[in-house]
Amino acid sequence: MEELQLQGYLEKDGSRQFLYPLIFQEYIYTLAHDHGLNSSIFYEPMEIVGLGYDNKSSSVLVKRLITRMYQQNSLIYSMNDFNQNQFVGHNNSFYSNFDSQMVSEGFAVIAEIPFSLRLVPSSEEIPKSQNLRSIHSIFPFLEDKLSHFNYVLDILIPYPIHLEILVQILQCWIQDVPSLHFLRLFLHEFHNWNNLITPTKSISVFSKENKRLFRILYNSYVSEYEFVFVFLRKQSYYLRSTSSRAFLERTHFYVKIEHLIDVCHNHFQKILWFFKDSFMHYVRYKGKAILASRGTYLLIKKWKCYLVNFWQYNFHFWSKPYRIHINPFSNYSFYFLGYISSVLINPSAVKNQMLENFYLVDTLTQKFDTIVPVIPLIGSLSKAKFCTILGHPISKPIWAELSDSDIIDRFGRICRNLSHYHSGSSKKQSLYRIKYILRLSCARTLARKHKSTVRNLLQRLGSGLLEEFFTEEEQVISPIFPKTTLFPLHGSHRERIWYLDIIRINDLANYLDWS
């Protein structure tokens, strides 16, 4: 239905885009509402005080919003009323807040259209590389590469301090000028009024109150900077491979030749300097990235300075150096994609025999290791209201109105997803504590619903009611290792298994990346 309604605004090849009229279409806001309901199992809709119905599901308010947007300067007046009512505590401020949220979510749906059109030509090739889309496919690559590297840059990707920079970057993806003007108007009014409340933190407030729109703007910015970054990285391969010359006098010494390359990128019209590093790997997920190198400490330090200057001179904002940490792999662990990863050094002795002589050779082997971050996971459970900050299980009041089967199914689904996602951990025993918290939280939620105690509930329903919370990993149904597999996975709490059917990070681990 939506595809038929979009045909009048878009060309098949995406060359002509008339996105601005979509802002006044009611079904756009319906799509935004449906996305909000299905985005996470932790979604908890707000209710309008005194009215008793879900604010995001009200088609009446959406129709009123569209009618007001047809009027001149209505968006400015709406946001002005919202911010003025915040100071005086007026009840109608919620309606203005609703207008701001719906405009933000509706425009985010529209902004996703140009990105989705770029994926249409390659839709036939996606099934062939389905396994490569899995998040877990990154870890075998890290196991193979990072164990031989010396240093890693742990990077928190900075974001522009001004929202106008994000709009300018979005122009590369959206050619509809009225839509960009509308976005500028919305962001300009939001920025001006929030500076009265929280100066210098406008973009932080915007990212929390308009998560979906901010994610679109942020992803376009990351895509742009990675395009330039990868372009420069590819250019470095055309440099000469000789990086040093040997001279023989009394002793051997080496004169290191630093290779620099002059690159002029048409989009920025600036000269960018790039250091040659043949052994470098870059991995990113959301706002965090790691840059690993086999080079020396001096080379990795130059990489840090280069990245700071790269963001400063090409995106016009200052990246704080403390957001980029230089760490040696030998004594450092980093959090990435819901795992705590490190390179373990295992000493071993090898017995060699030459003729009749025996001697021992001490060797060191490096192994890439991943474990479950228990304390951060408990913090995520605390944010989701499953336990206290200390890890004491509590009931989930908002789920107490559901049926018993739905409550057990929701808690059980969380446990199964956690076991499935953290199957690559070398120490799965630490997940038992997380399962215990969820099991007791489920029991307390059921006891709250039936107005009973946990002990009486388990005596009445039986202790086997919550058995699925301690299901072993080899019993979890998976398209890679089905339950009817012919070979048992003995010792699966020690074996690491990477599944190729996981295309998004677990919700609980997702809280950690954006916190």
From Swiss-Prot:
Subcellular localization(s) per the UniProt record: Plastid, Chloroplast
GO cellular component: chloroplast
Regions that span the bilayer: none
GO terms, biological process: mRNA processing; RNA splicing; tRNA processing
GO MF: RNA binding
Record keywords, A-Z: Chloroplast, mRNA processing, Plastid, RNA-binding, tRNA processing
Pfam families recorded: Intron_maturas2 (PF01348), MatK_N (PF01824)
Keyword RNA-binding: yes
InterPro entries per record: Domain_X, Maturase_MatK, Maturase_MatK_N
Keyword Repeat in annotation: no
Similarity comment text for this entry: Belongs to the intron maturase 2 family. MatK subfamily.
Record's function text: Usually encoded in the trnK tRNA gene intron. Probably assists in splicing its own and other chloroplast group II introns.
Entry protein name: Maturase K
Species annotation: Trillium pusillum (Dwarf wakerobin)
Protein's gene: matK
